[in-house]
């Protein structure tokens, strides 16, 4: 539910209308997996959506991806978003993803109030032709374990205050 898969599929459907050779890869499983697969089928684009299940080797996929989309309804610090930025992927997060996660100039925050078509247009306008190495991204971002620790620590404090 929190990952907003229905909206993700709607975005992809609009994006696929712009770039018809695109494929959506969904990694992970959950209680709503069958419902999400059925929704993809009803949307008429299930042939262009691949459900890869749980993976322990997601880092191997980053070089094959063109973008990462997280139109989440709520989110902590998404490690997948950090990893994708290390791989120099353009990332599209909803405004519900903490802005502290962003350290790349290819990180975009889009409101969930925008339509799937608007999301798709923004994603389609991104230049995916040039990607830097992980090392140069880390140097540019000054990203290190201390930075990651501070982000996680602040999130834990925020959660603790809610209890």
What are these regions (language model features)?
Residues 54, 73:
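Aromatic "clamp/platform" in nucleotide-sugar-dependent glycosyltransferases that forms part
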Residues 8-11, 24, 119, 152:
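A structural motif in glycosyltransferase catalytic domains
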Residues 68-69:
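A short hydrophobic beta-strand element within the catalytic core of glycosyltransferases
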Residues 130-163:
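A charged, aromatic-enriched C-terminal amphipathic alpha-helix characteristic of glycosyltransferases
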Residues 90-94:
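Short hydrophobic beta-strand element within catalytic cores of glycosyltransferases
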């Amino acid at each position: 539910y929190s990952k907003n898969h229905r909206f993700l599929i709607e975005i992809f459907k609009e994006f696929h209308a712009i770039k018809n050779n695109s494929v959506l890869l969904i990694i992970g499983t959950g209680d709503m997996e069958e419902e999400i697969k059925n929704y993809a089928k009803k949307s008429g684009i299930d042939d262009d959506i691949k459900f890869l299940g749980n993976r322990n080797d997601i880092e191997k996929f980053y070089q094959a991806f063109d973008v990462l989309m997280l139109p989440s309804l709520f989110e902590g610090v998404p490690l997948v978003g950090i990893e994708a930025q290390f791989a120099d992927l353009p990332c599209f997060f909803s405004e519900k993803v903490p802005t502290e996660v962003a350290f790349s100039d290819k990180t975009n925050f889009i409101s969930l109030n925008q339509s799937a078509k608007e999301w798709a247009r923004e994603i389609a306008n991104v230049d995916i032709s040039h990607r830097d190495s992980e090392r140069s991204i880390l140097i540019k971002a000054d990203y290190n374990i201390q930075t990651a620790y501070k982000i996680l620590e602040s999130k834990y404090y925020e959660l603790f205050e809610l209890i």
